[in-house]
Amino acid sequence: MAEALAPSSSANLGPGFDSVALALEITCRVVAEPAAEWSVTHHGPHSPAPGDDDAVLRAARTAVGDDNPLALEVFNEIPRGRGLGSSAAAFVAGAAAASRAVLGESDPERVFRLAVDLEGHGDNVGAAVFGGLVAVVGNVVRPLQLHEELRVVVAVPSRRLPTQWARHARPEVIEHEAAARSVARAIALIEAFRSGDLQLFAAAAGDELHEAPRGALFPESDDLMFTARSAGALHACWSGAGPSILAVTGPSEADAVAAALVGALDDQVVVLMPEIATTGLR
């Protein structure tokens, strides 16, 4: 028997579209054991609906082949369809647990490449495998420095926003000026996470490439970001494709930001205060 655990993640973080992600200590754990035939059992409230694609099973079969059947058990804490990297964590944990059960080990680079192929983009996968704050370009992933005093608060609306809907909301053509502003904001964001600089976090706000178009689909997310900033957050952004939002705070502001978000959206929101997952796949 073998097991693997992967953290959730918040991707994009505003201007870092499909290239930056932060790992969070909300986890997906998979236990794998050789069996006569393939099976998967899910525990907890965040299980795929009957008929939905099972990311853990697909990753496990891809990692070790159909001829090495496993009985899989999944213990998932990550809300699905809320922009918290649930599919990336499932792919990573499923591939790693299967590899450990059949091959005796799981190479992080192999798991990363396999999960990127399944996921289609590498930001959430990079955070799930390597932890912390990461930058991802294609199959190249590198850790970024993270100021030790930063804290995060996550607001999860009760209503889902399927990732494919959010992706279709993006404009097909981006004006040169908007693209240039986005690059500048991304640079400011990365340095803000390293230094904790308040002015740089402020400069990184206001993404035009994906947050603004998606706001029309789910304006409640924009309301949550406004609430977080008004309560003292250094930075607030869509978490991945949403509708969850991530608020970045200092240590003394986290409780106030969380309290403000708890009362938002007529209480149709769950507020989490996870630790940043400095370690990824384990």
Where are these regions (language model features)?
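Alpha/beta catalytic cores of group-transfer enzymes, especially the acyltransferase/condensing modules
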Residues: S106-L150, A236-W238, G242-L246
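Phosphate-handling active-site elements
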Residues: A35-E37, G65-A71, A98-L114, V140, ...
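Glycine-rich beta-alpha junction loops
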Residues: I26, A36, G132, V156-L161, ...
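DPxDG-like acidic metal-binding loop motif
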Residues: L24-I26, L84-P108, V129-G131
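Short beta-strand-to-loop capping motifs
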Residues: P34, P157, A247-P251
